[in-house]
Design a protein with these regions (language model features):
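Hydrophobic N-terminal alpha-helices or hydrophobic patches in metabolic proteins across all domains
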Residues: 1-176
C-alpha cells in the first residue's frame, strides 16, 4: 500500500467549490454548488497526477475534522468511484489519512461503512443536477488495487507529459 500527497481544495461540509489555480498556486472560488448539497468528505487531488479528464486525479479524504483549501494530506487510497461527467472519465479516489491511528485499520473499501459509500455516490451522481450544461453519470466502486492502479497511471501520465500539478515543466534530466 502506497501513500500519496493530496491537496485539499474543498473541506467537508462546504457548498463552495474552490479550485487551485495550478499556474499561480492561488485558490479561487469556482462556484457555489447549484444544489443544496455539501461535499461529503474533504475533496482535492493527488499531487503531480493527471486524470483522464486533463485535470489532476480527484481524491476524497475521510477525516474526522474538515481541513482547509490548500492543505496537504498524506493519503492512502482504499477505493475508487468511477464516474463520467460532461468532460469524460472523472474517477474519484477514496482515501484515508496515512498517519491517523484512528484510520490505521482502514486498508480496503469494504472497511468504510456502506452507508458512507452510498452517501458519497449519491452526492457525485446528483450534485450537478441543476447546473446548465453539466451532467454526471454514476458508475461503480472498485477497491484498493484498482485505486492504486488509477493513481499510478495518473502519476505516469503527468510525468510523461512533463507536468506537475503546478503545470510547470519538469526539468529535462536526460541531458544532465
Amino acid at each position: 500500500m502506497a501513500d500519496y500527497p493530496a491537496v485539499i481544495e474543498i473541506p467537508k461540509g462546504s457548498r463552495n467549490k474552490y479550485e487551485v489555480d495550478h499556474e499561480t498556486g492561488r485558490i479561487r472560488l469556482d462556484r457555489l454548488l447549484f444544489t443544496s448539497m455539501s461535499y461529503p468528505a474533504d475533496y482535492g487531488y493527488v499531487e503531480d497526477s493527471l486524470g483522464e479528464d486533463g485535470d489532476p486525479l480527484d481524491a476524497l479524504v475521510l477525516l474526522d475534522e474538515p481541513t482547509f483549501p490548500g492543505c496537504q494530506v498524506l493519503a492512502r487510497p482504499i477505493g475508487v468511484f468511477h464516474m463520467t461527467d460532461e468532460a469524460g472519465g472523472d474517477d474519484k479516489l477514496l482515501c484515508v489519512p496515512a498517519n491517523d491511528p484512528r484510520q490505521a485499520h482502514v486498508s480496503e473499501l469494504e472497511h468504510v461503512n456502506e452507508f458512507d459509500r452510498l452517501e458519497i455516490q449519491h452526492f457525485f451522481e446528483t450534485y450537478k443536477d441543476l447546473e446548465p450544461g453539466k451532467s454526471v453519470e454514476g458508475a461503480s466502486w472498485d477497491g484498493r488495487e484498482d485505486a492504486e492502479r488509477c493513481v499510478n497511471e495518473a502519476i505516469a501520465r503527468a510525468s510523461e507529459a512533463g507536468l506537475t500539478t503546478a503545470r510547470w515543466r519538469l526539468p529535462n534530466t536526460s541531458q544532465h
